[in-house]
């Protein structure tokens, strides 16, 4: 069975940090051979199971899913290097 890996970037309207994090996330994926998909969504439009499981109050928030199970979430911006470390630690690479 193939493992499905997704990273959701939860955003909100007018969030400059969200736009910065989106650029970093997409650049990290482009610069590496990662097979996860990236989904950028306003927090109100996230899948219901994410909105039920996580109380999102700060943005941007990255949500790491494996087979539709939340493995990890982190709020705020970070460097590309830090994001790569998280991806490696979670075996999302």
Task: Tell me the role of every PLM-derived stretch.
Residues 16-17, 45, 78-81:
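Short alpha-helical
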Residues 43-59:
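Short Fe-S-cluster ligation motifs
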Residues 10-12, 33-48:
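Thiol-based oxidoreductase modules, predominantly thioredoxin-like and allied folds used
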Residues 36, 44, 51, 75-77, ...:
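Alpha-helix boundary/capping detector
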Residues 1-34:
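Local sequence-structure signature of Cys/Sec-based thiol-disulfide redox active-site neighborhoods
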Residues 58, 63-93:
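Non-catalytic, surface beta->alpha helical segment in thiol-disulfide oxidoreductase systems
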Residues 32, 52-54, 90:
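Residues at alpha-helix termini
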